[in-house]
Structure formats: structure tokens, C-alpha cells
């Protein structure tokens, strides 16, 4: 029984199948993403979506889709599927689907009368290319396949419409054509492994709609250009490979290339292997620089997300070298930042006040996975430089006060992970003494003190420990209230009494200013008011402004983004905190909490975890289809569990 298999009943029910998406990527940031019935429902969907750096830093849809037609005895059966105005779908190729399986690679089986055709897709790892293999499993008469490519050549942030500027010219290449619709774009090569006929019949397919964009309150229709179609005969038992990429291939090698790519894949045959595959999709390499993308399909590399996700996406998979590759790029960006120079790398939001503290936390995980000695040898100077930068009050928005706490101004600009903004103003103006900033600060002080003490720098270690004593005492005085939980932020007389998840870090981190009884009180209230099967709520239902449903147009979603929605990445820190308090006796509870994520592997983005969930039942997945911090933290919990067995 395949772990990721969907039967005819589900596939032909568009209310179900259109809610499930697949994502395949390469190391360069290109991807293929669509629904499991190959009907694009987002402007971000496409068969071949690639970065075009000489235009901008966005991804661009070159090949939106490829419609296949089976031709037998003069009858045509179109396997494509698009949505048009008025909830009209055409040409309804999904009705021929018998099965979809993506345990190894995405494979769709169609049955049209006596014809059984299997379609398998693979996104090439090291170049911008998608390969599609068609195998005729059964047929009782001569069969021809027709392929009609739908071209977009536009940014994922925009739409294309019929226009006179589009270049209709094409050139023949071996077993195919190359074409480019607009200046600045690369040529798109479409080739088959077998001699075929290309029929030039240029046309625009108008009014194709993307219902997910409509749900999100955006424009949702466009026109796609079809230059013509390819036709090729296929015999029973024969396989034909279609290639779309930005460079020409040797057609006779396509079958071999396809097989080699298949052998290079780890099957998604379990919860762990799904997450492992998903983790690798966030790695982005541009020449010698390594990044972690925050999510698909629209996020770039964001500094905070990168440092939070990095341990789970690498160390939890025993991929220490991958951690070091990313940190090599990150260290250069950090040093540029603390030297008040342009960051110079494609890491966004480095200026956010907690980013350096999360970098320290990531390096702390590295020390635990390798050794303190190795961490000190490799990153000791960086850690000391970060600490000096903060202690010398050089950060433009992170101020060390005499009471030992860090203060940041978030009144006019969102500066924490709760970063939603409406009309230029933060929805949640977390400002002043922010609870997780100071939990991170205390943890960093103690960690670096211990690290440098072991390296012989007793003077600095004593300084940092003395600082931590002051910080810890003030932390308890400022944040802990009479109900046993922690204020979310404090700015003078303004105190946020909302029950939010940011206090859980004080229980999860290795070093905490709270004693065990205080930690348990924090854990208990998070368990009681914020825990859901899909993540930790961003706000308690008992607090004012609770809004658990992340739906509607952008402004409505922005107001709900951190007002009760559930976030899986927070579950990682929550479960780590739970194990700190309950140790072996908490194992069964932690394992039960992970079951709902196993269920998630066949929903939303198949084999991955979306950005967030509604905070109330049925806890529907929302936002980006695959989110790095979520995948990372669940992997990190699995790694923590493995150490108990």
C-alpha cells in the first residue's frame, strides 16, 4: 500500500482534489507546483517556474501547463483541466484519472476506453528542467499523443493577457522547438525523445481563472499563449519523454536522464521521508552561496526564518555539512550587518532585532549536535562578536538597558515574527521589552559564557554570567504576573496581558530565568489555552481580539494572521518544553501530538506542512503551501524523541 496514493473517487471530486497540491523544486530556486489533477489554481502554479535574475528577484512562470490529448481512430480525448468563468472546467480530463501516486515521483494513471496511459513527472535537480514520461500501458488500436503547451513568461506576482508584443516566432530544434515570448527571458526548449511533428497554430486561451487567488481577494484570471501542438505516435508498452527547460537537450538521452533522476530520489514512503524530502526543497544555492527559503511558493530567504529553520532542516537529518554551508553564507551577511555595511547577500530582514539572537540559538543547536569544542573552533569568534555588538548597543533597534533587559521599538514597524501590517502600521505593535527577545538574550548570555569559559576565556565568561544574573532577575520581575504566565511585552506602563505563545521559549530553551515551578505554570497555560492538534495558537480564545480564521482578502487575513491562528513551528518548541518538564513520562503525549502532522501528508501540499492553520476546528491549513520553520521544527522534535530510545 502506497503512503501517498489517491484513488479515482477522490481525484474526480474536484472539491477534494483541487485542495491538494504538489511541489517539486531544484537547488537553484526553480520549482514545479500545481494540484494533483494538474489544474492550476494559483498564479504561482506552473510546470516550469524559474528565477530570472536579469529581470528581478522573483520567480517567473515560463510553462504554465501542458495539455495532453489521446487520439485513437479519429476520436480525441483531452486530459487537460482549466477553470474558466462561472465555475466552468474544461476540458475535464480529470474524469479519466484512475489513480494518482506520488510516493516516488508524481504519477497519474488515465483510462480512456481501452487505453491506459501513465504520466510521470520529475523536476531535474541541477538544472531548470521538467521531464514528463508517458507510458502506454494498454491500447487496442493505433494511438497518437498530442501535447499543447500553455506559455506564460511572466512573474509569479503578475498575470499575462493577450497582447501584440508577445513574440510568436519559434525555431526548430532536434525533436522540438525553442521559443521566447519577451526580451530578457531565456529561451524555452520543448523537446521529445522521439521524432515528432510540431504544428504551428498560435492562439490565446482567454479567461483562465485561479480560484485560490480569488479566495485571497486578488485578481484571478489571465490569458495564456499556446504556440501550437506536438504530435507523436506511441505503441503499447512504449515510453515517451517530454522535456521543457532553458537549454537544449540531446533527445536520445532523455530516457536515461529520467531514470537517473528517479534513482536519485528518496521515496516519500513514510512521515519522516516526506519531511526529509520537504526539508531539502528549502535549500537554495546560488553559485557558492547557500540559503534557506522561508517557504513556497512566494517566500524568499528571511533571516529569522532561516536561523530558526536551519537546525531542523540540517542537524535533525544528520546533515552537519549542510548546516555549515548555509552558515558560511549567513556569517558573511551577519558580519556585514554588524560592521554597518550592506548585507550583500539575498538574506532579507537581517535588521530585525531578534535575528542575531536566533543565530546564536542556531549555533547552540550545532554545538549540541557536534560538540562545544567544534562550535567554539568554528564559530566562537562570531558568537563573541555578536555578543559585543549587542552589549555595546550598536544595533539600531535593540537597546540593552541597565536592568539587563533588551528594549526594541515596534510601535511604528513590525519587528517580531508577529509581523502583519495594515496601512503601514503593525497589527500587533509589540514594543518595549518583548518576552521572546529577552528569553533569547538570557539563553545567549549563558550559552556563550559556558562556551568561552571552556575555551579558557574566564574573564569574558564571568562578565556574561554576571550580566545574565541581572537579566534573569529583571526578567522575572518584569514579565511574570500573578496568574503565573508571562506578559507578552512591556513598554513603560503599557503591559500586554494577552495569552500568547511567545512565553513558551522560556521553557524550551536550555537556559531560562524561570525555575521549574514557574516553567510548569507557563507550560500549563499554553497547554490549556493555546494547544491545538495542528499547532500552537497565536492568541488565546479567552483574550480580546481572538480571530482564528485566516480567510478573505488580504486586509482581513492580515488582521487574523497572529490573532488566534495555529502555527506548527511553535509546536516544536512547545513539545521540547514539554519534554523538559516531564522527560520520559511525556514521550507518549509528544508522540500523540505528532499524529495530526502525519495525517497532513495527504492534505494541502502533499508531503509537507503549510504555513499556518485556523485556530478552531476543523483546523484548515492556510497560507504558503510549504513552510520551512514548520517542517524544521517537527523534524527537530522527531530527533529529540529519537534520543530517548
Please provide the spans of the model-predicted regions.
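Catalytic cores of carbohydrate-active enzymes
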Residues: 273, 391, 395-401, 442-550, ...
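Aromatic-rich carbohydrate-recognition surfaces in CAZymes
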Residues: 138-139, 160-163, 172, 234-236, ...
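Terminal accessory carbohydrate-recognition/targeting modules of carbohydrate-active enzymes
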Residues: 1-267, 297, 306, 319-320, ...
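Inter-helical turn/loop segments and adjacent helix faces that build the functional surface
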Residues: 252, 366-378, 447-464, 517, ...
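Glycine-rich, acidic and aromatic/proline-enriched surface loops and short helix-turn segments
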Residues: 277-285, 328-336, 599-606
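Non-catalytic C-terminal accessory modules of carbohydrate-active enzymes
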Residues: 79-105, 112-114, 392-395, 524-534, ...
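Carboxylate/His-rich catalytic cores and anion/metal-binding grooves
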Residues: 244-277, 308-311, 318-328, 516-529
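Carbohydrate-binding/catalytic loop surfaces
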Residues: 280-301, 339-358, 362, 366, ...
